């Protein structure tokens, strides 16, 4: 263990410092020329140590700068991705809202048109009923005329004494045309019965 420690120290220290320490251990004293040479060697050794320290520090600085740049690039890429994703979500939401509003407006317009058609339909039905009533009355009048003519022809000898009876009143207007037609068809039968009784 003791032998390995000096080896590690020798590897860590620059060669000028190693030579100086080795010379100091070997020779305890020396001439003035040797001291001058050692002083000059000491100055050059300091510059060498400074250069080594600067190189090591610069290399560490370069590594730190590279790591920070990589980290910043990752952060920027992630932030841009999230921002773009949020914008896309907002656009999708806006488009969905616009489509929903369009569908709702078109449905409201279509629903408004249907009740109008339903309101107009009953009026058309009323008009058709009103048109049917005059036709039914027109069909009724010839039957009354035929009944009066048949009564006069069947009993030519009999004359009306006093004022003649008024004609039967017209049936009340009904909402449907079928009952009115049936009532009109029943009137000639009644006239025939009256003529038979008179004869």
From Swiss-Prot:
Keywords per UniProt: Glycoprotein, Membrane, Signal, Transmembrane, Transmembrane helix
GO CC entries: membrane
Bias kind Low complexity: ranges: 147-163
Biased composition (Pro residues): 164-176
Localization: Membrane
InterPro entries: C11orf87
Transmembrane domains' residue ranges: 61-81
Extracellular domain ranges by topology: 24-60
Biased composition annotated in UniProt, kind: Basic and acidic residues: 95-106, 124-135
Topology versus the membrane: Single-pass type I membrane protein
Cytoplasmic side: 82-199
Signal peptide start and end residues: 1-23
Residue pairs linked by disulfide bridges in the UniProt entry: none
Protein known as: Uncharacterized protein C11orf87 homolog
Organism encoding this protein: Mus musculus (Mouse)
């Amino acid at each position: 263990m003791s032998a390995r420690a000096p080896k590690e120290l020798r590897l860590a220290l620059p060669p000028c410092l190693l030579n100086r320490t080795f010379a100091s251990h070997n020779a305890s004293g020396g001439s003035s020329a040797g001291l001058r040479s050692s002083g000059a060697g000491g100055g050059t050794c300091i510059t060498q140590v400074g250069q080594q320290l600067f190189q090591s520090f610069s290399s560490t600085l370069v590594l730190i700068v590279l790591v920070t740049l990589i980290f910043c690039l990752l952060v920027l890429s992630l932030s841009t991705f999230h921002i773009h994703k949020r914008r896309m979500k907002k656009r999708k939401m806006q488009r969905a809202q616009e489509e929903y509003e369009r569908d709702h407006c078109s449905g409201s317009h279509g629903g408004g048109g249907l009740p109008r058609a339903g309101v107009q339909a009953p009026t058309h039905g009323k008009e058709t009923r009103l048109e049917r009533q005059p036709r039914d009355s027109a069909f009724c009048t010839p039957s009354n005329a035929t009944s009066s003519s048949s009564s006069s022809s069947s009993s030519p000898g009999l004359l009306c004494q006093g004022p003649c009876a008024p004609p039967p009143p017209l049936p009340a207007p009904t909402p449907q045309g079928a009952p009115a037609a049936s009532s009109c068809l029943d009137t000639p039968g009644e006239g025939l019965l009256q003529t038979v009784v008179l004869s």
